[in-house]
Amino acid sequence: MSLPVALQLYSVRDELEADFEGTVRKVKELGYDGVEFAGLYGKSAADVKALLDEVGLIPVSAHVPLDDLVQKTEELVKEYKEIGCEYIAVPYLTEDRRPGTDGFERTIADIKKIADVCKENGIRLLYHNHDFEFKKIDGKYALDILYSEVAPDRLETEIDTCWVGVAGENPSEYILKYSGRSPVVHLKDYYMKSKDKPQKLYELIGIESGGEEAEEESFGFRPVGYGVQDMPAILDASVSAGAKWVVVEQDRPAQGDTPMNSVKLSREYLKTLGW
């Protein structure tokens, strides 16, 4: 059994900025079944929906910054509902909202409020993890605390398999841990020289932080199937957990590669597995 494959459009953000329509058409040509948004690049919901309908891509989900969702909950939920998205995902936590800070309780409270609005509008809210949620609080990972604090019918998982691996956990096992609550799984491959991740790892996705420099020699994102991940096991786990979609994401191409070629390689690899 295989699942439909979507592309997180953040992977080709520069191409979208330069030519939104042409890039969306190219994504379809590469064999993707759907897309996950990370912004609309100034386009209206109606125009985006019309383009996707014409091209034949399904609008799966949208990554929307948490603070934006807090400030404009109804507006944003209705905008992505108009496009046809089934899901909205909280994509990232700023440092003041992360586990280990006073802001984490506020994060959980805000997610609960947003989840209620999503449910009222027929949208399913997801949480997309990184590695910082694998900080233990009273012996329990913060990611698990979040999912225990918010009811399953209000918040579901969008397990990012790269960041689970970077955190030192098994991505397949984590997907299976949330069987029945894992409708969308992020397929992301990577290379990491050692088990000790660079402190400035997030600079590779455009976010400044303290610590040592992160360099391609020590860590880098890779097309799906070209890194350290056991992708067949991850795909099997996704099916077993009841996922509806898998989403390819590559934050940054490997040195010498391009974003579009990277997502092309990912899609071609998945096709070799019958996906």
Model regions: which residues?
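Acidic/histidine-rich catalytic cores of soluble enzymes
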Residues: 120-228
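C-terminal/domain-terminus segments
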Residues: 243-273
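A short, acidic, amphipathic alpha-helical segment used as a generic capping/interface helix at domain edges
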Residues: 226-239
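N-terminal pre-domain/capping segments
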Residues: 1-87, 156, 236, 267-275
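Conserved beta-strand positions in the central sheet of alpha/beta enzyme cores
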Residues: 36, 61, 89, 126, ...
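Acidic-and-aromatic substrate-binding clefts and catalytic sites of carbohydrate-active enzymes
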Residues: 13-18, 34-47, 64-73, 95-99, ...
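Active-site acidic/histidine proton-transfer and metal-coordination neighborhood
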Residues: 34, 66-157, 166, 177, ...
